[in-house]
Regions:
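Bacterial N-terminal signal peptides
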Residues: 1-6
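Acidic, surface-exposed loops and disordered segments
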Residues: 7-185
Length: 185
């Protein structure tokens, strides 16, 4: 038996509503993100589940405009117009200790999604941009942030006050779901 919230129940549940209405925002105003909001975003990231509670992450919050430009690699765009970027990194010293060594990407991805949802809940816009495993991006981000070899950038979350409000898309596709076994209805 599967429990599914009706559409009306979904719209009344704030957590579900936040998930269903989050969209990628790529255009931002000049307004800075407050230190309190930055800490809230980082706390949300650190609240993510991790394999064997390893918490194998390190976050770099970037607000300096020159550093944001350097992170953009001279390509301009989102990183140069945003107020904040949070680079989510895996800490290999933590990752390689004990059990759960293979799970740092999943753990840091869960933290990334928490930050994206927290940004939306705070009225901020955000978009997830990839880093790892693209060697050129990893090297560029690592150089810009002076990361030690044991800290690997997974992704950069570009964040700011939205200058656009795209309509959320309903991405539900029942053909992408099976029950009990592949192809099960």
């Amino acid at each position: 038996m599967f429990f599914v919230l009706s559409i009306s129940a979904q719209s009344e549940n704030e957590a579900i509503k936040n998930i269903m209405t989050r969209t990628s925002i790529r255009k931002y105003t000049d307004q800075p993100v407050s230190k309190a909001d930055i800490e809230t975003l980082l706390r949300a990231g650190m609240a993510a589940p991790t394999a064997v509670n390893k918490q194998p992450w390190h976050f770099v919050a970037v607000t300096d405009k020159a550093k944001l430009k350097e992170l953009s690699g001279g390509r301009g765009g989102m990183l140069e117009q945003c107020a904040l970027a949070i680079v989510v990194c895996g800490n290999m010293e933590k990752t390689m200790q004990g059990k759960g060594q293979e799970f740092w990407i999943q753990d840091c991805s869960a933290a990334t999604e928490n930050i994206l949802l927290a940004a939306h809940a705070l009225g901020l816009g955000a978009v997830w941009t990839g880093g790892y495993p693209m060697e050129e991006r990893v090297a560029s981000i690592s150089k810009a942030l002076k990361l030690p070899e044991t800290i690997i950038p997974l992704c950069t979350i570009v964040i700011g006050h939205p200058a656009e409000r795209p309509t959320p898309k309903d991405k539900w596709k029942p053909e992408n779901v099976s029950y009990n076994e592949f192809g099960g209805k």
